[in-house]
C-alpha cells in the first residue's frame, strides 16, 4: 500500500477543470493509473475532501486511505474505461470509496469485477411510497403512526422478520426477486414495474450462495437492520419540477410519503465476505497485482468472477424482497390507523433504486456502444428520459432518483439526465455521505442535544439502539442539500421535489 510523504504530493495531482464542480485527479497520484479520476464536488464539499487528505498525511502509521487515493487506486484496475468517478457524497470506504463509479469493458478478457466496488450491503437502496394523505391528516396521529411502524417493522442488529422461510422458499426468493413477493402476496404487480430492473436480477443463481449466507438471510427477510437504515414518514416540502413530480403522483406540498432505506442484511454481507476471501486466494493465478488488497478482484469472465456475479444477483433479489416486505408492513400500519385499504390510501411505490450494485449496461465510449460492467458503490443509477430501461410512467421525465438525507434532514427526489449518461455512466449521488466516523460521532455529540434538536423540528423518533442517535445525527454527515445541488448544477441529475421527515424509525 503506497503512502505519500508530503501533503502537497497529493494536492498537486488534483486539478480544477473548466467544467463547473469538476476536479480531475491526474495520472501519477498512484503508480499504474490506467485512467484519470473525475471528482464532482463544489467548494464546500472539496474542503471536506481536503481535510481527509490532511488527516491521512498527519497519521503516517494509519492504514486509512482518503477517498482521493482510493479513487486513484481504482483507476489502476485492469479493464477500467474512461475514468474512476467520485460523486459529491464521496468518502473513504473499503477498497473503493463510497460514492465511486467505475466501469469495466466486458469485451476485455482482463477486465475485472471487484466486491469492494459494490460494498458489503449488496443492493442497499431506497424505496419511496406515496399516499393521498396530507400533513393535516396525520399531525394528530404522528406519534401513533411512528409507534405502529416501529412495532410492525423489525429493526436493529440481529432482528428477525415476520416472513418465515424454509430452504426451498429462500432459494425461490433469491432466484425470483420481486416476482416471488408478488406471488406470495407481499407486493402489488405495479410495485415491481416501478422498481429498478423490475425488482429482479437476471444474473441471480442461489446455487452460488453459501450455506452460511443463506442461514444469515433466512430469518432476516422483511427487517430494517441498523446503522444508517431507516423507515421515515415524510412530507413534500418543496416542488422544483412540477411536471416530473406530477408524473410521480406528487402535486402539492405537504403530501405524505414513506421512505424505506435498507439492503440485503447479513446474507449480502456474507456473500461479499465469501467472494473477497475467494478472490484474494486466486488473484495470483490471473497475474493480478492490486495496489490495495481491499481491491481483491478477478476477471469478469473467470469462474470466480461469474460465481460472484450470480451470488450478488441473488443478494440483490433478497434486498428487493426485503424492501417489498417492509412496504407490505407499512401499508398494514397506515391501513390500521386510517381504517382504509392501502389502495384507497393510494399507497403506490413511486420508485425503488439501488446504490450498491454492479450491472452489465450499454454505454457510448468514444462514439461506440460498449457493454460495460458498471460498479456503483454509494451511487445511484440516473438514466435519462426515453431510455429503454426507464419505466413507462417516467419516460418523459427520466428515471426517479431517491436521495435519502440524514436523521432529521431533507431527502430529495431527482431525475436522470443525458449528461449523466455522457459523463458518469448514468450515475449520480446516493445521499449525504459521512463527514464524521461513527466513533467520533459518539464521542463528540450529545444524546440529549440530538434528541432535543429533533423535538424542536417536531420529528417523532423511534430507535432500537440509543448509540445510533449520535452516530446518525445530521452533524455526522455532509449537507445533503449541498450534495444534491452539486449534482444538479453539474447536470448529472435534476431536482424534482424535496421531502422532510416527520417520523423516523431506526435500528
Swiss-Prot record:
Q: Supply the EC number(s).
A: 6.5.1.8
**What keyword terms does UniProt attach to this protein?**
GTP-binding, Ligase, Manganese, Metal-binding, Nucleotide-binding, tRNA processing
Annotated cofactor note? Binds 2 manganese ions per subunit.
Q: Which GO terms describe its cellular component?
A: nucleus; tRNA-splicing ligase complex
The record lists Mn(2+) 2 as bound by: 124, 261, 355
- What is the catalytic activity of this protein? a 3'-end 3'-phospho-ribonucleotide-RNA + a 5'-end dephospho-ribonucleoside-RNA + GTP = a ribonucleotidyl-ribonucleotide-RNA + GMP + diphosphate; a 3'-end 2',3'-cyclophospho-ribonucleotide-RNA + a 5'-end dephospho-ribonucleoside-RNA + GTP + H2O = a ribonucleotidyl-ribonucleotide-RNA + GMP + diphosphate + H(+)
Active-site residues per Swiss-Prot or TrEMBL entry: 430 (gmp-histidine intermediate)
The leader peptide range reads none
Q: Does the keyword Nucleotidyltransferase apply?
A: no
Provide the binding site for Mn(2+) 1: 121, 124, 229
Question: GO: which molecular function terms?
Answer: GTP binding; metal ion binding; RNA ligase (ATP) activity; RNA ligase (GTP) activity
For activity, the cofactor(s) needed are: Mn(2+)
Q: Which GO terms describe its biological process?
A: tRNA splicing, via endonucleolytic cleavage and ligation
Q: Which Gene3D superfamilies match?
A: tRNA-splicing ligase RtcB
Source organism, top-level taxon: Eukaryota
Binding residues for GMP: 228-232, 355-356, 404-407, 411, 430-433, 506
Question: How does it associate, per the subunit comment?
Answer: Catalytic component of the tRNA-splicing ligase complex.
| Function per UniProt | Catalytic subunit of the tRNA-splicing ligase complex that acts by directly joining spliced tRNA halves to mature-sized tRNAs by incorporating the precursor-derived splice junction phosphate into the mature tRNA as a canonical 3',5'-phosphodiester. May act as an RNA ligase with broad substrate specificity, and may function toward other RNAs.
Q: What else is known?
A: Ligation probably proceeds through 3 nucleotidyl transfer steps, with 2',3'-cyclic phosphate termini being hydrolyzed to 3'-P termini in a step that precedes 3'-P activation with GMP. In the first nucleotidyl transfer step, RTCB reacts with GTP to form a covalent RTCB-histidine-GMP intermediate with release of PPi; in the second step, the GMP moiety is transferred to the RNA 3'-P; in the third step, the 5'-OH from the opposite RNA strand attacks the activated 3'-P to form a 3',5'-phosphodiester bond and release GMP.
Question: What family does the Swiss-Prot or TrEMBL record give for this protein?
Answer: Belongs to the RtcB family.
Q: What is this protein called?
A: RNA-splicing ligase RtcB homolog
Species this chain originates from: Plasmodium yoelii yoelii
